Amino acid sequence: MREVLLLGSLVVLALLSLFPCCSCLSQGAEEEEDDGEVRLMGLAGEAAGSPGSGGGFSANGKFSYGYASSPGKRSSMEDFYDTRIDGVDGETVGLFGVFDGHGGARAAEFVKQNLFTNLIKHPKLFSDTKSAIAETYTSTDSELLKAETSHNRDAGSTASTAILVGDRLLVANVGDSRAVICRGGDAIAVSRDHKPDQSDERQRIEDAGGFVMWAGTWRVGGVLAVSRAFGDKLLKQYVVADPEIKEEVVDSSLEFLILASDGLWDVVTNEEAVAMVKPILDSEQAAKKLLQEASQRGSADNITCLVVRFLEQENHLPERPTNDQAS
């Protein structure tokens, strides 16, 4: 047993030398030099280092969306988000995502720029949406790993995404960003945080030849606090980008969806988040409320919140400023 622990410690030390700024390891991550901009489906976005919010409506009037994002107490911004409302083969498709990077912003920005672009091109987007999503996660991860060959610092990202196709809502997730819906007034988690101490995740990692050990929290190889992610090429054998996908029917009982990075969920429960959003019809204001509450409760991480409100059961749409629209 002593030999196993010693070997594990040596492996951890070796990995730490390759993960100098992994935010899943330390809150005091070194600031990434090339954070870039957070952009929203081609709109003028907010600079990655400053708080921003915005939103809009679908052309068919069936849903509204709003987002709010801030670096919080961190000096660097590794959260990204994306919202798109695209017409594909005559169908309106809504795509929403929150991407929380670690080891810098590089991986999260790549996923934000490529995941939905790849998905709307998938030939099975309508005929087999779940397969299309799963295959797109995998192929986008492969593209990221190829792009990462020129970097000597490892980087990765979570992804919590929601796809609206007709009366179907499909939520896919890797990592510890989270999706929660309000249905019939109840808070329901529609994603699972991927942590290495979960029995099935730990078994999968160990079956692949890896190990999970305690280093402040349970970590893959003693380094990474999430068990699934995009990127993380040095741990890719164990840290997969295979999403868990859940489908919900969009009907009159489905009120809204919240997607958020762990900067929210570390300090706000699912039930609290739903209770905060429920009385606020304006999706942007709802997202801002969540962000403000997380900040007031002392969240130590970047905070990104995205709210999608389903409007078929509403009698009217709340007014929104015209400057949220594309210029």
From Swiss-Prot:
Positions annotated to bind Mn(2+) 1: 100-101
Positions with a binding annotation for Mn(2+) 2: 100, 262, 301
Recorded catalytic activity of this chain's protein: O-phospho-L-seryl-[protein] + H2O = L-seryl-[protein] + phosphate; O-phospho-L-threonyl-[protein] + H2O = L-threonyl-[protein] + phosphate
Swiss-Prot/TrEMBL GO biological process terms: regulation of intracellular signal transduction
GO molecular function, one term: protein serine/threonine phosphatase activity
Cross-referenced PROSITE patterns: PPM_1, PPM_2
Signal sequence, start to end: 1-24
Domain PPM-type phosphatase: 64-310
Co-factor(s): Mg(2+); Mn(2+)
The keyword Nucleotide-binding belongs to this UniProt entry's keyword annotation: no
InterPro entries linked: PP2C, PP2C_BS, PPM-type-like_dom_sf, PPM-type_phosphatase-like_dom
Keyword tags: Hydrolase, Magnesium, Manganese, Metal-binding, Protein phosphatase, Signal
Free-text remark on how the cofactor is bound: Binds 2 magnesium or manganese ions per subunit.
Highest taxon, organism lineage: Eukaryota
EC id: 3.1.3.16
Family: Belongs to the PP2C family.
Name of this protein: Probable protein phosphatase 2C 59
Organismal lineage: Eukaryota, Viridiplantae, Streptophyta, Embryophyta, Tracheophyta
